[in-house]
């Protein structure tokens, strides 16, 4: 009887230790995974967010970086703006 109880108790003890350490490591990994996913998401959105230049600011004609309107080249300087045309009746 004693001979069969010792292995059973030992196995129950080892299983309990495994369950405790598995829960502990899952909590640790879950926290670091959340943290790293936030970093990845932030870098993803920063790549998607296109920085634009407000109206009247310097711009690059080849880059199309104006928030509104187009990049207009006026007197050797490129600025963001909206080109208005006059229509005569």
UniProtKB/Swiss-Prot annotation:
- Tissue-specificity statement: Expressed by the venom duct.
Looking at the record's lineage, which domain of life comes first? Eukaryota
Secretion signal span: 1-22
Q: Which UniProt keywords are present, listed alphabetically? A: Disulfide bond, Knottin, Secreted, Signal, Toxin
Q: What is known of its domains?
A: The presence of a 'disulfide through disulfide knot' structurally defines this protein as a knottin. The cysteine framework is VI/VII (C-C-CC-C-C).
Q: Which family does it belong to?
A: Belongs to the conotoxin O1 superfamily.
Question: Which InterPro entries does the UniProt record give?
Answer: Conotoxin (IPR004214)
State any single GO MF term: toxin activity
Q: Where in the cell is it found?
A: Secreted
Q: Which organism is it from?
A: Conus litteratus (Lettered cone)
Q: Which GO terms describe its cellular component?
A: extracellular region
Q: Which residues would be cut away as propeptide?
A: 23-50
Give disulfide pairs as residue numbers. 52-67, 59-71, 66-80
Please give the name of this protein: Conotoxin Lt6.4
């Amino acid at each position: 009887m004693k001979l069969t109880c010792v292995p059973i108790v030992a196995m129950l003890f080892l299983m309990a230790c495994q369950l405790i350490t598995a829960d502990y490591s899952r909590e640790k990994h879950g926290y670091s995974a959340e943290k790293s996913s936030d970093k990845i998401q932030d870098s993803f959105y920063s790549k998607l967010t296109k920085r634009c230049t407000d109206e009247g600011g310097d711009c690059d004609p080849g880059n199309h970086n104006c928030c509104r309107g187009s990049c207009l080249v006026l007197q050797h300087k490129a600025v963001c703006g909206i080109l208005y045309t006059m229509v005569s009746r």
